[in-house]
Regions:
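Basic, low-complexity intrinsically disordered segments
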Residues: 1-158
């Protein structure tokens, strides 16, 4: 049986299968990430509406965070700070978008939070999100590119 592993056809076949598995895993991660961002958008939308309509303040958000953490102890991301970040995420984009904008929906949540903290215009956030997707930037690289004013260099190249 081990002799087969030395044949070129076999090595090509196993390589093709491994590549297919890796591609499928990458798509699954992206799908999960996109769904999480949709969840965070919806939570942010609800928090925004409740705070405007019911004048709920930070004490209510604090209690929600505690209740969510108790209900989902193995899940991260439901701290008071995270809930406020979800509201900020929604509030930042909702004047122009009804759903999570496409390039942003392909980014990890940490990247999104970095952009919201460091970039003030929707247009620039979308530019950085697209660049992250195209170039596969880590969060550290994204932060560096923002500090180096990547958007100005790209603007000069266009």
């Amino acid at each position: 049986m081990s002799e087969i592993t030395h044949h070129t056809d076999y090595r090509q076949a196993i390589t093709a299968i491994k590549q297919r598995i890796q591609a499928s895993q990458a798509r699954a991660v992206m799908a999960v990430n996109a769904e999480l961002l949709n969840l965070y958008w919806d939570i942010g939308r609800q928090l925004d509406a409740w705070q405007r309509e019911r004048a709920w303040g930070s004490a209510v958000v604090e209690q929600m965070a505690l209740d969510l953490q108790a209900s989902y102890p193995r899940m991260k991301g439901f701290s008071r700070t995270s809930l406020f970040a979800m509201r900020q995420f929604y509030a930042f984009f909702s004047p122009q978008f009804e759903v999570v904008p496409q390039p942003v929906g392909q980014m990890p949540w940490g990247h999104v939070r970095t952009l919201l903290a460091k970039v003030k215009s929707v247009e620039l956030v979308l530019l950085y999100a697209q660049a992250c997707f195209e170039h596969g930037w880590s969060r550290t690289v994204l932060e560096w590119q923002i500090e180096q004013r990547f958007h100005e260099r790209v603007g000069q190249a266009v």
